[in-house]
């Protein structure tokens, strides 16, 4: 990370730390945190993710649809038990921040994830509760989330080696700066005062569920 990015990150962390003191969060329980799922033309993984979340007791789910055109998905939306926000155009992974929904969700704790990121079967069911507690323990951390599981990436995935190399470098770096380790979780900061991430409990590509701290930042 460059000196400029490090400085910017640290300033941002202090800014949101002070905002949290001045205007405390209204969220007291992890199950109250809204989960916004960014989706484009994915049905199978979307349903698997929502089923996994609800099975763990996390039901405050919203789907942000990036102008999907897949007929079976559009049909599913008609009976979907969750609120679906339909965008008029595909705004990509930054859709939440580029849409008016930013004002609704990004002024307190929120979870923003892709629809193809599924917690592994051996992931503890209280993972969001755990993330929430750990984020509270680290007041200068702005977000927290899974890291990728890389032992099951298919050879057909063209970026396999790139992902493995990147995750390996991050793991080696973070082991040297580990902030806490338990028999269930291994927490690791990815950058100074910016992010705490958990070892492989996510079984899908490309990124992981992240819990940004109140009033921003996110993956």
Where does each model-flagged region fall?
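C-terminal catalytic/acceptor-binding lobe
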Residues: 3-18, 167-219
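Conserved beta-strand scaffold positions in the cores of enzyme catalytic domains, especially
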Residues: 84-86, 110, 143
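Conserved catalytic core of nucleotide-sugar-dependent glycosyltransferases
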Residues: 93-95, 120-200
């Amino acid at each position: 990370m460059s000196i400029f990015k490090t400085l910017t990150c640290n300033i941002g962390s202090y800014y949101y730390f002070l905002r949290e003191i001045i205007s405390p969060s209204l969220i007291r329980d992890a199950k109250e945190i809204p989960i916004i799922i960014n989706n484009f033309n994915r049905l199978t993984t979307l349903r698997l993710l929502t089923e996994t979340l609800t099975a763990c007791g996390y039901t405050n789910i919203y789907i942000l649809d990036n102008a999907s055109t897949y007929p079976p998905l559009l049909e599913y939306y008609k009976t979907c038990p969750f609120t679906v926000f339909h965008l008029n155009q595909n705004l990509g992974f930054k859709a939440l921040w580029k849409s008016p929904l930013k004002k609704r969700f990004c002024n307190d704790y929120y979870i923003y994830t892709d629809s193809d990121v599924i917690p592994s079967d051996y992931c503890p069911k209280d993972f969001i509760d755990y993330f929430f507690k750990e984020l509270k323990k680290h007041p200068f951390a702005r977000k927290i989330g899974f890291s990728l599981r890389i032992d099951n990436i298919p050879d057909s995935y063209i970026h396999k080696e790139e992902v493995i190399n990147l995750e390996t470098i991050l793991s080696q770096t973070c082991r040297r700066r580990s902030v806490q380790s338990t028999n269930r979780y291994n927490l690791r900061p990815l950058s100074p005062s910016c992010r705490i991430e958990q070892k492989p409990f996510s079984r899908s590509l490309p990124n992981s569920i992240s819990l940004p701290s109140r009033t921003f930042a996110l993956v």
